[in-house]
Amino acid sequence: MSLSVGKNKISYNDPRLCEGQGLELQIFNKPQKMIRNTNVDVTNKALPFAKPMLADGTGNLVELFAGSRSVGSVAEAKGMNVFSVDWQKFDKIDLAIDIEELQTKDVPFIPDVVWASPDCTTYTIAAISTHRNGTEPKSDYAKKCDAVNKHFISLIDEWLLINPKMVFFIENPRGMMRKMPFMQRFKRHTVWYCTYGDDRAKPTDIWTNSEVWQPRPMCHNGNKNCHHQPAPRGSKTGTQGKKGSYNRSKIPTELCQEIIESSILAVV
């Protein structure tokens, strides 16, 4: 299985995909789309930092780049309504679509929470020289990823205009994403998966407007007091040892629970 982007093909199991979902679609570089369904251009405006308020104690969650639905499954167990979107029709995905084409009208509700786990392929340190010169894209797929990410951020902006108390979380393994210009207006935390019960260290950045969620203290490489597997580059331990991007992209249940519980903490 492979993804074609311009003249290039990327294998579904190519390690350069990092946590990507192994896209089946023919996806081509397209210019960033402006927000539809609104006459207000909020692309360059700072986002409000809102306290989460879910009126009925459950609320609605949109899960973008959902893959294995790590967050969505936990949210459903808490009684939330979940709409899961991905490039591929994995199990229990509600809408399979090129997320650059997704519009707010495609989602059956206004979300209280948005979780997004965009493809890290072109931002990961292991493949950065293939795809970028610093933050500038040099591959077709890097251009595509930037366009997709700018687009879903525009959807977050649009939902926030309708529901200013909505909280959002954007997740990506620690890498070049934190340097991208379109991410600079967001508050960023860094978590280590091992502190949430995972056997991988996997330092991961999470951007959010939540004032409630506070991540656990970070671990560090070579920490002999932690259970995480040593995973030097090229080894078969840690995230690199997981077979397929679907498994590599799974988020620790304890982290998902913490995110969801913090999002419903301020329910009236």
PLM features: residue spans?
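Conserved active-site and SAM-binding loop architecture
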Residues: 7, 14-17, 27-268
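Accessible peptide chain termini
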Residues: 1-2, 34
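Short Gly/Ser/Thr- and charged-rich N-terminal loops/segments
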Residues: 4, 19-21
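Serine residues within intrinsically disordered or low-complexity segments
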Residues: 2-4, 11
